Amino acid sequence: MEKYIIILVFILVAIAVTFATYNLSIIRSMPPEERYKLLYFKDNQVSIGIGLVRRTYKLKDIREVRFSKGKAFRSMGSWAGRMKICKINGKTSRWIEFDGTVYYKKMVYITNEEIIDKSINILMNEFRSRGIQCNKYR
């Protein structure tokens, strides 16, 4: 029984390493200015995120995008922005969190409320330029 548990642990570690390697290879292959983007628009579609966790939506299926902000979970006072895609058929995405990386275009560790507001405005302008309604709450 102990052998099977050890084998299972090694298999899970191998899967985690493969997942991390795949995501890092995607990020490394991108040009530097593209690595820290949250939204990727292409062929009337928007992709959110990078790698295996990327979600793609057709622009014509999006009714609105909702934005909010709040204190980041388990942080020492850092703020996070949140975005939710609402589709025409009534379904909504999960809340997608982002930080000051959207504004600074480089990795940041602590973000204040002002930078989150600027990041939300950047994302709202990207959606509005493509004719999608955006609302900011709180």
Q: Which residues are covered by each model-predicted region?
A:
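Short, exposed beta-strand/loop patches in secreted or surface proteins that constitute
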Residues: K37-K42
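Generic alpha-helical hydrophobic packing signal
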Residues: N44-V46, Y57-L59, E126-I132
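Intrinsically disordered, low-complexity boundary segments flanking structured domains
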Residues: D43, L52-R54, S119
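Alpha-helical transmembrane spans
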Residues: M1-R35
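Non-transmembrane, membrane-adjacent beta-strand/coil modules in membrane-associated proteins
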Residues: E33, S47-I110, R138
